[in-house]
Amino acid sequence: MNKAEFIDLVKEAGKYNSKREAEEAISAFTLAVETALSKGESVELIGFGKFETAEQKGKEGKVPGSDKTYKTEDKRVPKFKPGKTLKQKVEEGK
């Protein structure tokens, strides 16, 4: 599903009057999640899931086919843990 199709789905599910309203709702939601995660906070929507950050350790490696090595730094990355209800809905959709 692409963004335009998702906007249509949100418009119907949320009973918005226009695609613009649905797109604004999606933008507000994503901005709120981005803001919370950038502050190190988590966002938990009971039944749907939890957005949080995790520390990803740096690693060392070797470039295949050469003797060059590289090292990456530690960084914070976003994570999503699906909730029980979401898992059940996905399972039912099989």
UniProtKB/Swiss-Prot annotation:
<dbReference type="GO" id="GO:0005829">
    <property type="term" value="C:cytosol"/>
</dbReference>
<keyword id="KW-0238">DNA-binding</keyword>
<feature type="compositionally biased region" description="Basic residues">
    <location>
        <begin position="78"/>
        <end position="87"/>
    </location>
</feature>
<dbReference type="Pfam" id="PF00216">
    <property type="entry name" value="Bac_DNA_binding"/>
</dbReference>
<dbReference type="InterPro" id="IPR010992">
    <property type="entry name" value="IHF-like_DNA-bd_dom_sf"/>
</dbReference>
<dbReference type="GO" id="GO:0030261">
    <property type="term" value="P:chromosome condensation"/>
</dbReference>
<comment type="function">
    <text>Histone-like DNA-binding protein which is capable of wrapping DNA to stabilize it, and thus to prevent its denaturation under extreme environmental conditions.</text>
</comment>
<dbReference type="GO" id="GO:0003677">
    <property type="term" value="F:DNA binding"/>
</dbReference>
<feature type="region of interest" description="Disordered">
    <location>
        <begin position="56"/>
        <end position="94"/>
    </location>
</feature>
<comment type="similarity">
    <text>Belongs to the bacterial histone-like protein family.</text>
</comment>
<keyword id="KW-0226">DNA condensation</keyword>
<comment type="subunit">
    <text>Homodimer.</text>
</comment>
<feature type="compositionally biased region" description="Basic and acidic residues">
    <location>
        <begin position="68"/>
        <end position="77"/>
    </location>
</feature>
<protein>
    <recommendedName>
        <fullName>DNA-binding protein HU</fullName>
    </recommendedName>
</protein>
<dbReference type="InterPro" id="IPR000119">
    <property type="entry name" value="Hist_DNA-bd"/>
</dbReference>
<dbReference type="GO" id="GO:0030527">
    <property type="term" value="F:structural constituent of chromatin"/>
</dbReference>
